């Protein structure tokens, strides 16, 4: 049985309680609110709960024996962007890069991790990142990103690249550039490798994106749920997905990462 909570935390709790009362041994859940996951854990009671795609803000909640998480490590998604940009600008002989950043929804783990990751990678690779302007917040929305970037383009602001927390916002920046008559002779980078994002990389409008594997996450969540129900080791069957446990933490057996993959013009055909 599948239910859509329509971004409503109270509905999500209700659906979990209904599933458990109806005899479900495990529930797979993409939490509406990463800060409110303890309520979902309470709702599932002694049954099994698999969080997918969006982890609890408080990872220690995963220490419970009947709770696990399957997703992709956001620490690496932005880092792949930064590695690409560092290599690009090193080849141009630049050691300092002025960037415009388009962020998703503030407070979300993905926004924070992706934004921090790209800057860390630039610094780790010997590039000094400098804000050309304060980050704009577009809530992962394409039209909002287009609207927010437009005035920065027409103001004559100097920058070397545009970094977006996802493909939709990167594509909004592409549209803003085209509307303003700005030649895209600088890298615009995104994350998720959506169909439109991959096409933009192929066409040269975006320099790169980062593939997040939704099928792998879904399969991993189902495998984890089955393992929990049948008392198997949680990682059983995860090997073919390339899943990695988070071995540095005491709740490592409850976290499984489905790897992100960098996508450029060289390999984008493999993702279309």
Regions found by a protein language model. Give the residues of each.
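Solvent-exposed loop/turn segments at secondary-structure junctions
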Residues: 6-8, 33-36, 55-59, 75-76, ...
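Flexible loop/hinge segments that line or gate small-molecule binding clefts
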Residues: 39-76, 98, 194-202, 206-207
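Short, solvent-exposed amphipathic alpha-helices that sit
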Residues: 77-84, 109-128, 144, 148, ...
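Hydrophobic alpha-helical
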Residues: 13-22, 26-49, 118, 134-200
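Short beta-strand segments enriched in small/hydrophobic residues
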Residues: 1, 31, 67-68, 97-106
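Hinge/cleft segment of the Venus flytrap/periplasmic-binding protein
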Residues: 98, 102-106, 110, 125, ...
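Hydrophobic alpha-helical segments within soluble ligand-binding/sensing domains
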Residues: 12, 69-97, 144-146, 193-197, ...
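Short beta-strand elements in bilobed, periplasmic/extracellular small-molecule ligand-binding domains
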Residues: 1-5, 98-101, 122-142
């Amino acid at each position: 049985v599948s239910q859509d909570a329509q971004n409503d935390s109270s509905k999500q709790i209700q659906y979990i309680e209904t599933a458990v009362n109806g005899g479900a041994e495990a529930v797979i859940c993409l939490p509406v609110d990463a800060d409110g996951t303890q309520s979902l854990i309470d709702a599932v009671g002694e049954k099994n709960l698999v969080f997918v795609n969006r982890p609890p803000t408080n990872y220690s909640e995963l220490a419970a024996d009947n709770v696990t998480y399957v997703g992709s490590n956001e620490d690496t998604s932005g880092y792949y962007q930064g590695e690409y940009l560092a290599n690009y600008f090193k080849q141009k002989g630049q050691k300092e890069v002025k960037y415009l950043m388009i962020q998703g929804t503030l407070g979300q783990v993905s926004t924070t991790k992706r934004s921090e990751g790209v800057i860390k990678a630039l610094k780790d690779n010997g590039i000094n990142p400098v804000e050309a302007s304060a980050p704009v917040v577009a809530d992962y929305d394409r039209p909002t990103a287009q609207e927010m970037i437009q005035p920065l383009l027409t103001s004559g602001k100097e920058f070397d690249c545009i970094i977006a927390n996802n493909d939709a916002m990167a594509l909004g920046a592409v549209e803003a550039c085209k509307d303003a008559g700005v030649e895209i002779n600088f890298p615009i980078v995104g994350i998720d490798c959506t169909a439109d994002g991959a096409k933009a990389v192929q066409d040269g409008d975006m320099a790169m994106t980062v593939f997040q594997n939704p099928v792998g996450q879904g399969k991993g969540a189902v495998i984890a749920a089955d393992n929990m129900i049948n008392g198997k080791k949680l990682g059983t069957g995860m090997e073919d997905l390339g899943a990695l446990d988070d071995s540095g933490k005491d709740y490592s057996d409850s976290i499984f990462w489905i790897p992100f993959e960098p996508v450029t013009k060289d390999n984008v055909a493999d993702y279309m």
